[in-house]
Every structure is written in C-alpha cells, then in structure tokens.
A protein has these predicted regions:
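Conserved beta-hairpin
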Residues: 66-107
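A membrane-cytosol interface segment of integral membrane proteins
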Residues: 124-161
Length: 161
C-alpha cells in the first residue's frame, strides 16, 4: 500500500501536543503543579500563606501549560524541515516501511519501530520513546485503506523485540 502526503500545520501541532502530553514526565509535572496550586489555594483561603503564593503557583501552571501546549510544538514545527516536505510512504508486510522524498529514501524494517499510537489525525510510528514519525490518516484514500494500514501496523510493530 502506498500513500502520498504533506503535513498540515494545525494537525501537526495537535499531533506534537498529543506526543508531549503522553510523556509520563510531563503528566507527573502537571499533576504536581496542580497539587501545589490546590494546596496553595487552600492555605491562602485559611490565611496560612499570603495570596501571592497562590498567584505564583497559578502563574507557574499557566506558563507550563502554554509551554507544552503552544511553544514547544510550535518551536519543533518551525525547526523541522520534515513538516515542509512531500512524502511517498509504502507499507509492505514483508519489507517494512519505505519513505521517499525528493531528497532520497529510507527503508525501515518493522522491528525498527518500538510501538505505534493512533491519534485524531495521525499514526505515530515510534522508533523509541522520544523519536517518531507521523503518518497523516487523511493520506489514505478511504477508510478501508486506513483500516488495512492500522491492521498492518498492529500486526508488525512492537513484535520480535
């Protein structure tokens, strides 16, 4: 199966956000900051601390949220040439994944991928926990082709590791 695609900025930013929010360290950081903000609010209400402490925790939470939700995905999008290229991607049960651009091509065997994840707009093909490749779901010509690709990925990615 072969698909041709480029990237839509809005969808890529959403896919990158999904990746960041799925990271355990980001989730833990958000939980800790929320707990500290709630504790600071309670202590401020009970007059145990000054309200400025609650404002500081609120500002930290807001800044972290903006960083992970807006700034980090946008900076990666702007730095990466990948999102400006046009691709041809071939999925083959025997060969693996062949990616072609005007600058060259790369073939990955299925066992080069550690896992895959599906989000609203993309299939995320992970090489390891931090590096991945996004395959837009709208690049498939119809729902049946997308289901076939999903089945191929489920059967071949993460096996034999």
């Amino acid at each position: 199966m072969t698909v041709h695609f480029g990237y839509n900025k809005k969808e890529v930013l959403d896919g990158l956000r999904s990746h960041f929010f799925s990271r355990p360290e980001i989730r833990i950081l958000f939980i800790l900051i929320n707990v500290f903000a709630i504790v600071a609010a309670l202590l401020a209400i009970l007059k145990k601390i000054q309200p400025v402490s609650f404002l500081v925790f609120s500002f930290l939470w807001f800044f972290l949220y903006l960083t992970v939700r807006r700034f980090l995905p946008l900076s990666i999008y702007k730095r990466s040439q990948t999102f400006k290229d046009e691709f041809t991607l071939s999925l083959d049960e025997e060969q693996g994944v062949l990616l072609q651009t005007e600058r060259g091509q790369k073939l990955w065997k299925w066992n080069d991928f550690s896992m895959f994840k599906e989000t609203l707009y993309f299939f995320h093909l992970y090489f390891d926990s931090r590096s991945f490749f996004l395959v837009p779901k709208d690049s498939f010509k119809d729902l049946e082709e997308m289901k076939a690709a999903r089945k191929l990925m489920k059967e071949n990615i993460g096996k034999n590791k």
